[in-house]
Amino acid sequence: MARPLRCATLTECDGAIPVALCDNGSVHSYRDEGIVLTGHKLGEADRIVTVLTRSHGLVRAVAKGVRRTKSRFGSRLEPFMLVDIQCHVGRNLDIVTQVELIEPFARGIGADFDAYSAASVMAETARSITEAEPVSRPQFLLLVSAVRSLCKGEHPPRLSLDAYLLRAMSVAGWAPSLLDCAQCGAPGPHRAFSAALGGAVCSSCRPSGAALPDTDALDHLAALLTGDWESAEGSDLHDQIDGSKLVSDWASWHLERNIRSLSVLERT
């Protein structure tokens, strides 16, 4: 987990505000903007929340008493809420001391199963990518933008999800080759796609078991990656389905784990 102790000055924090310093100059408490990813019960009234913050990376903190009816900020710490959060630095887990709501994304997508499912996959992916990342601002901004789009219903949820996964993986350094051969650089388009080899591959480099999508499916993914929504939404349904499968395999391969919420989504 990225620890807030690395933010020792206002300039280093890039907008985050340390509100108290220890005698040795390290941050004793801090304030930051974050989006809640998950929450788990702790004891009778507390909850452990995982928050992806703008400047402090992935934070796990105890929110005391939030499950009580009269809690001051219990509903503000539900998954997908964008909040201004203040925490005290703890030995193992930080302690939430104050929360102000910025945007209530959870309220906008909670009644839409497809949107909620897509947001769950986004949150799980963001957590996996940033667990060992000390600098997470690009991933934070990308996630906030994607969840805000879901909340507004700007695009079909599955297309929004695929676009987010492609972009999140690319920001993390795992951008797929969608035209030229990922192995030898031979000009494309190519028919085969291998997550293990980096994306599209030519017939000479194609490994056994490579996916064989139509080239239009790769064009669809390129449109999602670049934000060409007119082309993406106009793609044939078969190409969208093939593209979703490629994106799922790509993300799972590079994260070295199955995305549990994505597996649930694909079974529905």
Protein language model annotation of sequence segments:
Residues 17-268:
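Non-catalytic alpha-helical scaffolds and adjoining flexible linkers that form interface surfaces
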